[in-house]
């Protein structure tokens, strides 16, 4: 498999053709079914289906899919920026039982020359008055693309929804390790963003997989649901494999938290992201 190529090295004539190739190869949005009118042809609003693989064993919506649906980028999009996420925060208000599709209502708080601040409401697409979660985040721009952008023809993959469908961590080949941690394979074209770094999608999924597994080891089937999810993207994941490192913090007041770091084992164990999950 060819190694991902950093789009910033492309010359003007080939920039957008490389972007289209990267966008249509990236697995995150195609598999989860998330579409965006700025980036995808023929799309009117940001939506994503909610399937069985996006819920826990009790049918409650998970944090990673919602964070991917919102994909906070500080109000930046690839048409005018080369966005790189810095933080993502999510508060879940509703388990989304019975919801088949969510809609994201984005709001740019402030967009500067190189940094942006954004927030979103994630609602039931059939009943927008039903708020599922609140999302917010920040991002920086790694540069400015050349003119000539056009939305990409990138329809979602056809994924049949069923109770026995593969879990998201299985689709992204995130595997358990001895000691309770998890490993995401080396960077590939299916997991790389246009700047040839590990995309936010696999990071959210790997981090929440590790957090949820830590909770189940502690509480079994009685593990409470996730309420708050926060991720800091602290460095670009360039090599891999990527390995989690987690710790559970049991508060005396009844709350439980799990902190998870994702390390690039092929790049001197560099921490590339850090998550906090509150249950």
Locate predicted features.
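Terminal targeting signals and extreme-terminal segments of soluble enzymes
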Residues: 1-279
């Amino acid at each position: 498999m060819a190694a991902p190529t950093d789009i910033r090295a492309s010359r003007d004539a080939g920039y957008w053709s490389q972007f289209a190739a990267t966008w249509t190869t990236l697995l995150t949005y195609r598999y989860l079914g998330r579409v965006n009118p700025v980036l995808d042809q023929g799309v009117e609003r940001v939506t994503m289906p909610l399937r069985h693989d996006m819920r826990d064993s009790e049918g409650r919506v998970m944090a990673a899919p919602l964070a991917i649906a919102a994909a906070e980028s500080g109000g930046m999009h690839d048409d005018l920026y080369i966005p790189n996420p810095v933080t993502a925060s999510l508060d879940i208000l509703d388990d989304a039982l019975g919801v088949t599709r969510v809609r994201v209502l984005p709001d740019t708080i402030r967009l500067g020359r190189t940094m942006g601040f954004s927030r979103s409401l994630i609602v039931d697409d059939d009943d927008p008055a039903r708020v599922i979660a609140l999302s917010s985040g920040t991002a920086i721009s790694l540069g400015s693309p050349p003119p000539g952008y056009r939305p990409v023809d990138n329809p979602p993959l056809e994924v049949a929804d069923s109770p026995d469908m593969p879990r998201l961590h299985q689709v992204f080949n995130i595997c358990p390790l001895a000691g309770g941690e998890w490993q995401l394979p080396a960077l590939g074209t299916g997991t790389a963003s246009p700047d040839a770094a590990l995309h936010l999608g696999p990071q959210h999924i790997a981090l929440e997989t590790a957090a949820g597994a830590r909770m189940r080891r502690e509480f079994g089937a009685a593990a409470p649901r996730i309420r708050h999810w926060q991720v800091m993207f602290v460095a670009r994941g360039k090599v891999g494999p990527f390995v989690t490192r987690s710790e559970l913090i049991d508060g005396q007041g009844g709350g439980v938290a799990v902190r998870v770091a994702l390390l690039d084992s092929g790049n001197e164990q560099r921490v590339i992201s850090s998550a906090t999950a509150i249950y």
